[in-house]
Structures are given as C-alpha cells and as structure tokens.
Curated annotation (Swiss-Prot):
One GO-annotated biological process of the protein: proton motive force-driven plasma membrane ATP synthesis
Subcellular location: Cell membrane
Catalytic activity entry: ATP + H2O + 4 H(+)(in) = ADP + phosphate + 5 H(+)(out)
Database matches in InterPro entries: ATP-synt_VA_C, ATP-synth_a_Xtn, ATP_synth_asu-like_sf, ATPase_F1/V1/A1_a/bsu_N, ATPase_F1/V1/A1_a/bsu_N_sf, ATPase_F1/V1/A1_a/bsu_nucl-bd, ATPase_F1/V1_b/a_C, P-loop_NTPase
EC number: 7.1.2.2
Sequence similarity: Belongs to the ATPase alpha/beta chains family.
Quaternary structure and interacting proteins, as annotated: Has multiple subunits with at least A(3), B(3), C, D, E, F, H, I and proteolipid K(x).
Highest taxon of the lineage: Archaea
High-level lineage: Archaea, Thermoproteota, Thermoprotei, Thermoproteales, Thermoproteaceae
Protein name per Swiss-Prot or TrEMBL: A-type ATP synthase subunit A
C-alpha cells in the first residue's frame, strides 16, 4: 500500500505506486501531505498534492489510503470554515500556532466533524419499519436555524432492510443510532458518513426548475431570473462587483442552506468576504447567517491543486443538504481560478494543451460541475423534493468574455449575469449588463409570478426590456446628432429607459430599504414605470412634449421610490402612487385639450 517519490514538479509528484487507482487519496512524503492520484501509467502514479511540496525529496514514501478524497457529512458541519480538503481552519490555526496553515495536518489532528459532540436524536422511523437508502432515520437540532436530518446513506454497502433497533436520546456524532437488518446482515448506522467528492449523489428523478429563487436583487429576479435548482454565472473583470454580488446572494437568497466556496481568490479579499459573512444576520430571524452556512476557503496563496478539491467539496456538501429536503445555494468565487489550477496540473503531467493552455477536458469538467445542480425527487421510500442551485463567478482576464472558461461556461448555464466595468465605474450597481445578460428560466418561472404576484408580470417585464434595447439603439443617434434629432416618442423612450435604470435596475446593496426587494415591491416598481410609459404615449399623441411629462412631480419621484418605500408597505404605497401618477398625466392631457 505504499511506494516512493520519483520526481517533484511544483504541485505534481510522480511516484512508483503499484496498485494506485485514479482519484485515490494518498499521503506524500515523511510529513504526510494530502495528495490525489490524477493519472496512472502502469505502476507509476501522478499525484496532485494539496499542500506545499517544498522540501520533498525523491525516495520519500507515498502511502495509499485505498479510498477516494471524500467529504465527511454529518452534524457539526454547519457554521464551519474549511480549507479545500475539509480541514477546519480554526483547528489548523490552533495546531499551527500561526496565521499560515502548517503542512501535514491530517484528519486525525483536525477532523472535519466534531465526532464527540452530543445531540438529542429524535427518530423518524420505528423498529420493524422498512427503510431504503436515502430515507430519513431521524433528526437532531444542529443550530437554531437548521434541523439536521440523519439519512440512511445511499452508498452501495447500504441496502434496503428493516429497522431492528432505533431509540431517541443523547448520542455522540460517532455513536450508532440505528441497526438495520438486511439480506447482507445487520448494518449499524451512525450520524455521519463519508461521500467521494467527485461522485454526484444519486436521486430518483430530475424535475423542471419552475420556482424562482428569490434573491432580493431586482435585475436578477425580474429581468434575468434563476430558478431553484438552476445554474448561473457571474463573469466580470476586477472591480466590477463580483464579491458584493456573491455577498448579497448569500445574505438574501431564499435558500435554507448557503455554501460559499472562495476558490483561489486573493487572501485579503477572502478575509474581507469572511469578515462580512461572519457579521451577517439572517434577515428573517436575526440569528447569525453562519448558523445556516458552511464556508470553503482556498485562497490564492494556498496550493494550486486544492482549488479543484474545494469546488467539488462545496458541491458535495450542498448535495448532502439537498438530500435532506432543503433548498441549497452553492456560490463559487471563482471558477476561473479553478480552471487555472487544472491548467497548471495538466501541463505538469504532460497532457496536450488546448486553447490558451487549458486542458482539452475543461468543458467536460465545467459540465460535470454545473450538472450537479437541479431540483430533484430524492432517494428513499417517501417522495421528498430538494434543490441545489449553483451560482459561480468567472474572472476573465481583462473582461474578455471570449476566453475559454467564460465561453465554455455559457454552454452549461441557465442564467448569465455579466458585469460591466462601464456600469461599475459609473456607480451603477449591480453592474449587470442588461444587453448581454440572459436567462433561460423566464418561461418556466412565469407561471409562479403570474399565480403569486400578477398575470401581467411577463408582459410588463418584456416591455421594459424592449425599451432598454431601443434606448441602446437611440444612444447611437444621440452621440452623433444630439437629442434634437429625435422625435417626441423617441425622447419619451429615453426618459422611460432612464427611469428603468435609475428607479429599478440600480440597487444599493448596503441600503436596508433598497435591498432586499420583495417580489411584490419589484412588480409594483416595474408597474409604476410601465404606467409612466403607457400614459406618456397617450400624452405625446395629444401633443404634450416628453420634457413636460418628465417635469411632473410624480414622475420626478419615480427614481427615488426604491429607497423611500419599504417592503412591508410596498403594496399599499406603490398602488396609491401608481394611481396618482396616472391621474397627474391624465390631468395634464385634459388641460392641453
């Protein structure tokens, strides 16, 4: 079960390791660095090492574990901050006695779960009942916000059987909480189990994503929505607001579980993001957001190879909570750094490079990652539904969306929210470019909006979007000939587009009145602008100039409404405002006649 190092090249080690398997977890060198086999040629194994390889020497031992890199899944996972291979950073700091991670800290020193922690276990099944892989055996209260459901793991060794023994009471995470009698004998079930990070967890059936994931961000929810179980990418250059977008989603998205994966970001940016996340409160309960969050951190000064592990680790933890029936949101920041890690390892082991040096299997890996999202019918005897939504930022060099990571990501996602440096530098946040963005979920979530908010939601949304497209066309004329060359109708289009940009799309992430924006507030803000557009067309037909309409008191107030009216009074206040707006425009028309 062991071999010897032959050569070392950065994060890649070649070893003589008979019997090694692809993606097997190994310990490299005298200090037992974490590594994963990424290529096998006969008895030779190429290993990507998840820790700094400085000081390793040819001839040092490489020890096989016989199992793949796996996530430890069970109570005490919530509220933890892990590195890319699921070692708790707090434990590592205590062992290292330094702000930097010591090498060779194994799971025996820093276990991912606190196996000695005690919980009150409440069974969901009784002795004599039949259980199947994926069934919920019971539950424990892990935090004030989250009830942790203990599953009969959907692993090959766990087969259907009958509950022989199960009882409520106080148990440690590592204690046996049930015994299941099967054809293969009696299986003892503990509160936790391991799952290989590269293997998607099974489900019975994938469902269409029909319910929108409300994020509180108007540009996303109304213009370019994402559904529960959907996928989205947020590409943008440095300084365009990717991290603030991720922070806003983590705080206000209506998912029960949030899993931010900080993958390859700069150390100071990751520290800022962590400090921000630790201070955040759950908007519904006022409890710390960390009580429903698990964070994976893998900064750019940590070893390159561990970036790949961190993305898979976060997704596996997300799937585990999805299997408990929760709506889960995984936020990866950023997949470009993950792809760069893949490129470095692929070049070191001598694989043929493709476009810009990335490996030829880059599209396959991206597809495998995004395809783990979905709204699914879960394993087990009872019909339960859970969802895993994935939103990932992409950092294209120089904001070039034609580079391989962004262009390949576009093939596998349902919503595309590109961030524009032009909008960011003009202080328009979120800086999502409405001319480039798209969502494939508009048709599927339309039913939910029509049923729960208003039947004319789609018509108003499409009208506002078409006005923004017309504005872009008219801006070309204005740049060359000025506004004097435009008709009154075209001037009105520009005025309405300004209202859409300033009064609807723009949103202050740090203003509690403006963010989050409830679905009814979003709809009525949109309807107010639509009323200005429709009534304005009638006024222009009656001979009233667009400049006169823009100076009306209610119209002047339109861009400020988002910051004046709170979610709890939005329905009454905005409905009243729309009536006043229509009345003022109609009074202006009657005076002219």
């Amino acid at each position: 079960m062991s071999g010897k190092i032959e050569y070392i090249s950065g994060p890649v080690v070649k070893a003589d390791l008979p019997g090694a398997r692809l993606y097997e977890l190994v310990f490299v060198g005298e200090i037992k660095l974490f590594g994963e086999v990424v290529r096998v040629q006969g008895d030779k194994a190429f290993i990507q090492v998840y820790e700094d390889t400085t000081g390793l020497k040819p001839g040092e031992p490489v020890v096989r574990t016989g199992e793949p890199l796996s996530a430890w899944l069970g109570p005490t996972i919530m509220g933890k901050i892990y590195d890319g291979v699921q070692r708790p950073l707090k434990n590592i700091e205590e062992i290292s006695k330094s702000p930097f991670i010591a090498r060779g800290v194994g799971y025996d020193q820093a276990p991912p779960l606190d196996l000695k922690a005690e919980f009150d276990f409440k069974p969901n099944v009784k002795p004599g009942e039949e259980v199947y892989p994926g069934d919920v055996l019971g539950s424990v209260k892990e935090t004030e916000l989250i009830t942790h459901y203990i599953l009969y793991p959907p692993l090959p060794e766990y087969v259907p059987g009958t509950v022989e023994w199960i009882a409520d009471g106080k148990y440690k995470v590592d204690d046996v909480i049930a015994r299941i009698k099967t054809k293969r004998g009696v299986i003892e079930v503990k509160m936790w189990h391991k799952w290989p990070v590269r293997r998607p967890r099974p489900f019975r059936e994938k469902l269409p994503p029909v319910e929108p994931l409300i994020t509180g961000v108007r540009t996303i929810d109304t213009m370019f929505p994402i559904a529960k179980g959907g996928t989205a990418a947020i590409p943008g250059p440095f300084g365009s607001g990717k991290t603030v977008a991720i922070r806003t989603l983590s705080m206000y998205a209506q998912s029960r579980i949030i899993i931010p994966v900080l993958c390859g970001e700069r150390g100071n940016e990751a520290a800022d993001a962590l400090q921000g996340l630790l201070k955040l409160k759950d908007p519904n309960t006022g409890r710390p957001l960390l009580e429903r969050t698990t964070i994976i951190v893998n900064t750019s000064n940590m070893p390159v190879a561990a970036r790949e592990a961190s993305v898979y680790m976060g997704t596996t933890i997300g799937e585990y909570f999805r299997d408990q029936g929760y709506d889960v949101l995984v936020l990866a920041d950023s997949t470009s750094r993950w792809a760069e890690a893949m490129r470095e390892v692929a070049l070191r082991i001598g694989e043929m490079p493709s476009e810009e040096g990335y490996p030829a299997y880059l599209p396959t890996r991206l597809a495998e990652f995004y395809e783990r999202a979905g709204r699914v019918v879960l394993m087990g005897s009872k019909e339960r539904i859970g969802s895993l939504t994935i939103a990932a930022s992409v950092s294209p060099p120089g904001g070039d969306f034609t580079e391989p990571v962004t262009s390949n990501t576009l093939r596998f996602i349902g919503a595309f929210w590109p961030l524009s440096p032009r909008l960011a530098y003009s202080r328009h946040y979120p800086a999502i470019d409405w001319l480039l963005a798209f969502s494939r979920y508009v048709d599927t979530v339309e039913v939910w909006w029509s049923k729960n908010i208003s039947p004319d939601w789609r018509k108003i949304r499409d009208t506002l979007q078409s006005i923004l497209v017309k504005e872009a066309e008219l801006q070309e004329i204005v740049r060359i000939l000025g506004t004097e060359a435009l008709s009154e109708y075209e001037k009105h289009i520009l005025n309405v587009a300004y209202m859409i940009r300033e009064g609807f799309l723009k949103q202050d992430a740090y203003n509690p009145v403006d963010t989050p924006s409830s679905p009814i507030k979003q709809y009525l803000l949109m309807k107010a602008i639509y009323a200005y557009y429709e009534e304005g067309l009638k006024a222009i037909e009656a001979g009233i100039p667009a400049s006169v309409l823009r100076e009306l008191e209610t119209v002047k107030r339109l861009p400020r409404l988002r910051m004046e009216i709170t979610n709890d009074v939005a329905k009454e206040e905005l409905t009243k405002f729309i009536e006043m707006l229509i009345s003022e425009i109609r009074t202006t028309i009657s005076k002219r006649q």
